[in-house]
From Swiss-Prot:
GO terms for biological process: proton transmembrane transport. This is V-type proton ATPase catalytic subunit A isoform 2. The keyword Phosphoprotein does not apply. It catalyses: ATP + H2O + 4 H(+)(in) = ADP + phosphate + 5 H(+)(out). It comes from Equisetum arvense. Catalytic subunit of the peripheral V1 complex of vacuolar ATPase. V-ATPase vacuolar ATPase is responsible for acidifying a variety of intracellular compartments in eukaryotic cells. Keywords: ATP-binding, Hydrogen ion transport, Ion transport, Nucleotide-binding, Translocase, Transport. Belongs to the ATPase alpha/beta chains family. V-ATPase is a heteromultimeric enzyme composed of a peripheral catalytic V1 complex (main components: subunits A, B, C, D, E, and F) attached to an integral membrane V0 proton pore complex (main component: the proteolipid protein). One of its GO terms (molecular function) is ATP binding. Coiled coil: none annotated.
Amino acid sequence: AEVPMPLRQLTMTLPDGREESVMERTTLVA
């Protein structure tokens, strides 16, 4: 899925070393 540039830059590195976009993370948590 293509993520808009502003959101694409908002990535966080998970403890297991993966990078996950904040947008995806919010969807999983919600």
